[in-house]
């Protein structure tokens, strides 16, 4: 469960390292965002000499959360960290690599480019 002011790791090589959520896209008064939701975030930590810089406002899709994800078949998935992938306005990832495992639910939400870049899909 991601809410405003939550810090997230970045799971791609776009140049950002840490994000802070400031808004959940598509929700006027939703409190929490889950896996597959798009958020507006500010970059809190970045790699030097990369296109993305600190204090830049970007969009990102959540790919991992510490809160459990319950599937219809009874499977429960929990990750060790909260992580997101930086995307552009069309929903394509800004980075060329994705690190770590991501959930299968992203494929159903039309983030197929992110799923194809991921090394492991759970």
Curated annotation (Swiss-Prot):
GO biological process: one example: translation
One GO CC annotation: chloroplast
Gene3D superfamilies: Ribosomal protein L14
Transmembrane segments: none
MF terms (GO), sorted A to Z: large ribosomal subunit rRNA binding; structural constituent of ribosome
Main subcellular location of this protein, as a coarse class: plastid
Function: Binds to 23S rRNA.
Protein name as annotated: Large ribosomal subunit protein uL14c
Organism the protein comes from: Buxus microphylla (Littleleaf boxwood)
High-level lineage: Eukaryota, Viridiplantae, Streptophyta, Embryophyta, Tracheophyta
Gene: rpl14
């Amino acid at each position: 469960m991601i809410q405003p002011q939550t810090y997230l790791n970045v799971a791609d090589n776009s140049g950002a390292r840490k994000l802070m959520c400031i808004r959940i896209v598509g929700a006027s008064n939703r409190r929490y965002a889950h896996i597959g939701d798009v958020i507006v975030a500010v970059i809190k930590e970045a790699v030097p000499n990369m296109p993305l810089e600190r204090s830049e406002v970007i969009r990102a899709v959540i790919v991992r959360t510490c809160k459990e994800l319950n599937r219809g078949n009874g499977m429960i998935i929990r990750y060790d960290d909260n992580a997101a992938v930086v995307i552009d306005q069309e929903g394509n990832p800004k980075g060329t690599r994705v690190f770590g495992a991501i959930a299968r639910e992203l494929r159903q939400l039309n983030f197929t480019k992110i799923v194809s870049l991921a090394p492991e899909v759970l």
